[in-house]
Amino acid sequence: MTFYQELQLNQAGSKNLLQKSETVKEKSYHILVYLVKIAVTMAFCFLFVTIFSILFGNENSIVGVVVLLCLMVFRNADLGIYTGQSTMLLALFFVIMTVCPHLANQLSPVLGMLLNIAALAVLILFGCHNPFMFNQSTLVLGYLLLYGYDVTGKSYQMRLTGMALGAALTCFIFYRNHKNRTYKRNLNDLVQEFDISSSRTKWQLCQIICVPAVLCIAELCNMPRAMWAGIAAMSAILPFMEDMQYRVRKRIVGNIAGVICFTVLYFLLPSSIYTYIGILGGIGVGLSAKYGWQAVFNTFGALAIATESYGLKGAVSLRVIQNVFGVVFALIFCSMFYWLMSKKRKQW
């Protein structure tokens, strides 16, 4: 494996190489490559989002984050169907992520929920056909981020331009990297494979219904940062209940641990470098292969932004409440939904 090929490995792959190292020299080499990968990734991400902020305004820096997520994921991941059809679907997904979150913010919580359900149905049914590729962690997360950081007026016009550029970049990279791959299925096959009795379809329906429901309830309760609850729910919903229960436990414990660590850093560090706590969290996520640790470090970035608006106490309270509510609601909802579907299946 070349230096460049090793740089392409994810955290789990890199750590697997470290564990299999037989000599100190070999292990030191893999550690060096791993650290270089983290440094290069962080530098590239920071530069990419900064450029988007300069071009389209600081209020649209989140567009840079969403586009970056799509580029990094879909340069390797696919949608499981013909490359041409997949490319057109990606363009459609960008249209949905650009328009629907903005429109949903203009509606009442209930009407917004219905629009979000319709939008997520397209993203998940056609973009997340394989749950174990975790495309929902890109598409649904991107949708929720744009929903939570909505803008209006001139800023939204700039957002339209930024997302159009992001769509063009993502589709170009995706098509270039996948055009020589052979796929035997097409868009119609995805429709025909919709089966209410399958674990995949039940998982998709849970994502489609539960995430917007969580957003709606949080907004009806006048809870700021409703997207946090939605992201927590999305992250916890998996096809198998045992995996969901594991995620819920790790999400709750990870967020509480992250809040405690962030609070300690907040009081120890000078106020001039508070914003860099989020960058520290990004590095931590890059070094983490397990979901629990990722939940800890993801908290840093979220709180670094939220403390500017709500203060430390308000941001910490919101983070814990929204995450616990999101994952617990998702667990209860999916447990009932899976049980109901199993009862229906027996009747059929």
Regions found by a protein language model. Name each.
Residues 1-137, 141-297, 305-348:
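Alpha-helical transmembrane segments and their membrane-interface boundaries
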